[in-house]
């Protein structure tokens, strides 16, 4: 069971299908029909919920946590909640794998790394992994309008302003995967620039 804007759900559903497991994906109803169709084609049971902020108990992430707990009580085989936002194995995989691949494929000639944030696992994990090799590498955040991270890392204020058409990117809280991250640069990217 996972709450996702689609991408992680697609990956989890693909793996679940391969191993013969059932996947249940809780997704905001505002996500693209293409993602929803891909999830259904992979055999996922799709639970669409209204888009709500994380503070709302019916936010798709919180809803998926409750659903996993309920299914775990009644299912013969149990249920597992992936919890991509706060499961630090997400970040760990990027420390141990993604950052090492980047380092090896650039022959160590990398001055910096920049990406946007969904769960925070990629940015924080690659940051840690690259800085373990050489601490002077620069790390940047490319944050869409509507996300709170740009203001948090530039002004110390965790506050969302505006909106964006990007799906699954932008964060309104410091996830466990983001804890301790201190990017060297933060950029607020408007939709016009991103597209």
Language-model regions: role of each:
Residues 46-48, 79-81, 139, 186-188:
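Conserved beta-strand scaffold positions in the cores of enzyme catalytic domains, especially
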Residues 1-29, 109-123:
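A short, small-residue-rich loop immediately preceding and capping a beta-strand
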Residues 26, 49, 84, 140-142:
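Generic beta-sheet signal
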Residues 58-61, 86-185:
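Glycine-rich phosphate/pyrophosphate-binding loop at beta-loop-alpha junctions
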Residues 41-44, 75-84, 175-182:
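Gly-rich Lys/Arg/Thr-decorated short loops/hinges at beta-loop-alpha junctions or inter-strand turns
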